[in-house]
Amino acid sequence: MSGYDNRDDYRHSSSSSHHRSRNSKHDSSSSSYRSHGYAPTRRRSRSPSSYHSSSRSHRDHTTDPYPNGSGHDRRHDRDRNRERDRRDHDSPIEAAPSPDGRRFHVEGAPRQGGRRRWDEGAPTPPTAAAPVHVSDPTRSSLNTQLPSRPIVAPPGMAPGPPPSLPSSTPIVPSTGISISPEEQAKLAKKARLEAWRKEQAAKKALEEARQRARSIASAVAPSSQRTESFSSSSTPQTAPTSINAAGLRTLSLRTDPSRTTAQNRSRTMMDDASESSKRIHLSRLGDLPPLDPSIDTAHIATTSVDAEDDDHQLGVAPPTQGSSAAAMDVDDDDEEEDPLDAFMLTVKSQVAQVNDDDRRKASASGGHERTQAKSKAVVLGRDDSDGEAEDQYEELDELDRVGMATEDLLALAAKKVKKKDLVTVDHSAIDYEPFNKAFYHPPAEIQDMSEELANQIRLEMDAITVRGRDCPKPLTKWSHCGLPASCLDVIKRLGYSAPTPIQSQAMPAIMSGRDIIGVAKTGSGKTMAFLLPMFRHIKDQRPVEPSEGPVGIIMTPTRELAVQIYREMRPFIKALGLRAACVYGGAPISEQIAEMKKTADIVVATPGRLIDLLTANSGRVTNLYRVTYLVLDEADRMFDMGFEPQVMKILNNIRPDRQTVLFSATFPKQMESLARKVLKNKPLEITVGGRSVVAAEIEQIVEVRSEDTKFHRLLEILGELYNREKDARTLIFVDRQEAADDLLKDLIRKGYVTMSLHGGKDQVDRDETISDFKAGNVPIVTATSVAARGLDVKQLKLVINYDVPNHMEDYVHRAGRTGRAGQKGTCITFITPEQDRYARDIIAALKASAAHVPPELEAMAASFKEKLAAGKAKAAGSGFGGKGLDRFELDREKTLKAQKSAYGEADDDAKAAAAGDSSEDKAKTGAPPGASSSEDQLSKIQGMKIEIMQGAAPESVRDNKTLSASQEASAAAAAAAAARSKAEPEQELKEAAQLKAQEAALEAAKAHGADTTKLAAVLENIRRQANARKEAAKNSELDKHKDRKARDPDATDYHAIVPINDFPQRARWRVTNKETMRHLIESTGASITNKGVFYKEGTEPQPGEPPKLQLLIESNTKSMVEDAVREIQRLLVEATQAVLEAEARNPGTTGRYTVV
């Protein structure tokens, strides 16, 4: 034979070996071959006696026919040929013909001329053949447990079934090589270790899925990585269901079921490659739930092919049945002890102890520990594992009730949509960084100033009044502030010549570390009064690092005010090297999250969006850990526009020793006590020119006129203004958004370029409106009171209150949009005779600013006072007092009504009206009021409950048909009989108690010497009748069950029906799509079948038609049905929540696509 031919033979045999090794990854014969010194790639001499004899001796050349060193290659090829012979000997299949026409076959089998078909078995190897090579014990043990599987063979190869081995223990064939006792002991140890591992993996997969696994893991080791080991196995043989058991075994999930909250109580285990790969990186697991000694490992089938492949990739031998695992401490390769195995050997007692302690605590406290765990403080953004555990507890508590109605699930989904709660922080448990907030060192000229001179300066500066002790003296120059030079340069470049009155008194107080309430008229420089001390405060601290929150926070009630503050601070932060972010609702939150992740020293925000960012991604976007300087601008409106609960949530999560600053142009008395709750550090109240006063530079005009004359008067005023001054700006206030848009249309028809500004417009439109208004492109803007706060527009000469403001503070802020920074302006207010209840507030504002009060207005106020005294009118509200909370409640009620209406449930008003009509009808007929309506409502709610029924599903449900009236009556009778059967145990208990009482009476009579023969006979008769009745009932139930089993072999012991017809389309699709159904079946072990068809709202199925869309859940175990129902409820809630969120983001869109 030539060397070229021999190499061809080797290449072919190597290819055949490659095919076999890919189809059976556990074929470790090559590694066993190398372990005995037969590696063909090592070029070294070997003793011929160490090899077993080959049947093809004509290939064993002992001489080197090639001179010049080629004999070494020839010996190398010979070794390869011998390896190929060994593999052919071990393989049960017949190899393909080689390039030279020879065919390899099973040793000892007769050669056949034709090819064997796939359905033909391979011939049995002879018992007395050539010495068999020693195979790897792992391979032998595998053959004893793994089911046979088809081998993917190359073309021309027809495999037969593998030879069966009679024993489940590793069999070492007789060979010419003797195995030492140490190696035999090692093989036996290895087999036992593999069997023990398989048993432990099966128990762990079953036990870890129980409901207590999460609580133990979170309580004992909340930060450790939870691992779940899933292995594919067959389900135990139980009563058949409507889904073929063999088909279920073929299903295999390749996804991670970590989000599944249902307990995997079934014995169906999943093979998860991702979870298996995690095992090799763990050195220690958290405390596990108790191991159930009742699990019978004999029912657990052998591992699947996929499990073999995963174990082979991990370097772990597949499990093998063996004896006890007492001494299982041998590793596969180097005999070192596996840390995981060592831990598993000692974990049983620890797990049992932990489980007993936890069960004892739960029974003693009744769940008090969970309440304490929820109330524990967690720093926002620092450790989110506890927060996730609390969310899981809440979700389990809400979804743990199997019998939830459809409206309950929808309410739960709506609740989750709005759920944006901040975790309450226990500040005593947090070690905050110390910070300095007292930077003010007055210069000599201020320090030497006497108290009388300081009071005189305050009086000259618009009559500054201060409430509080030890207030610093007012400053008169920018150089007195101690600001950085770069900051003073920006002040000089902006043209700020001297501090305004509020700045003169507020800045030294803030820089001394005091909390203040600053009240000053509009346009008096309040923004700079809190911005400049903030810059000095932030520069004194270390820079903000990634994943840290801001140092200073400014909260405003409106988006426009937040944008304006951000624009005013930009020249300063650029010069000082600081970063700031402006976040508000209406803008995409993704962009704002990106800005926050870049770190920001200062955040200007509206309260709602700030809470969104604090709760986004479990608090990982930003946090309040480093906040030491807090500003509430327009503080009175912060506690009035519905922000009070949101503001308090944020404030309660900021460190208590922070510095808090409140500013506003108006601050009513009723808001003072509410605001003082947030001031901690010796607060001061600084008021400039009165609490609610319009600036003296603003001319105030009030006109009393009817509604139909207001628009013509408006056109007259605009004509006079723009004839006199073309570049002037005009801001017109109305009370409603619709009124702003209507007035906009009327002015455009008259030829005036106008735009509207209110909360119903998109944020982009609002920003463009303000930009065009400031630039002069649009001279007139109609707006609601959303533009009354903080809007600063140059050349704004005229403000018109087209609709009168409803309280004095709103009037002051509206008028304050003009006359900014000492300029002149005009405010004209229209009031109708029907709005006389607002006349008193307007008069108070006019008198406070020493403006002229029209006689008509005074007469109107006097007339209203008389009506009020006579009880014919009601006084107007002050505009404050937390009306936003009521508005939130109204919004929630409206949302709930909309949901009930969408899903066919009447709202409370409709129910009340129906109940009233029903009561009237019953009053005529003599029926008790409210009886029928209550019964109808109760039956409707009970009909929507998801109840776990004992026994097989009704035939009408299985046949997918709606019952007729007579059939429903018979079904109701059967249900009543079932209810009576349920009540029988109680009756039996009563009879038993009566029987015991009679026996006691009998014994007492005997003790007194009475004749008890007749009484004893009566008692015996009663006892005999009771036993006969019990036996008859038992036999009847058995007969019914046998009869049903005979007619329907798929009948189960428990079933439940989940109606899904009334849920949104996405929710229905979520629970009925193929992947979800397969996952539910495998994770819960119950049979789930889709029944019925979809009916639109108001449509009911007729008798004989399919029922409404529903899911039929069946199983022989009640816990499996409960798990399936609970998981379906969770999916329905999540899908409905997603629908509600989508509708909230894109209201009014009904198509599949939205316009970006």
From Swiss-Prot:
Documented EC number(s): 3.6.4.13
Q motif, short sequence motif: residues: 476-504
Top-level taxonomic group: Eukaryota
Domain Helicase C-terminal: 697-861
Presence of the UniProt keyword Transferase in the record: no
Bias type Pro residues, positions: 152-165
SMART domains, A to Z: DEXDc, HELICc
Span of domain Helicase ATP-binding: 507-685
Subcellular location: Nucleus
Regions of compositional bias (Basic and acidic residues) in chain numbering: 1-12, 71-92, 356-372
Keyword Nucleus tagged: yes
Known catalytic reactions: ATP + H2O = ADP + phosphate + H(+)
InterPro entries named in the record: DEAD/DEAH_box_helicase_dom (IPR011545), Helicase_ATP-bd (IPR014001), Helicase_C-like (IPR001650), P-loop_NTPase (IPR027417), PRP5/DDX46/KHDC4_KH (IPR056149), RNA-helicase_DEAD-box_CS (IPR000629), RNA_helicase_DEAD_Q_motif (IPR014014)
Biological process per Gene Ontology, one example term: mRNA splicing, via spliceosome
Group of enzyme by EC: hydrolase
Keywords attached to this entry: ATP-binding, Helicase, Hydrolase, mRNA processing, mRNA splicing, Nucleotide-binding, Nucleus
Entry similarity comment: Belongs to the DEAD box helicase family. DDX46/PRP5 subfamily.
Described purpose of this protein according to its UniProt entry: ATP-dependent RNA helicase involved spliceosome assembly and in nuclear splicing. Catalyzes an ATP-dependent conformational change of U2 snRNP. Bridges U1 and U2 snRNPs and enables stable U2 snRNP association with intron RNA.
Record protein name field: Pre-mRNA-processing ATP-dependent RNA helicase PRP5
Organism: Mycosarcoma maydis
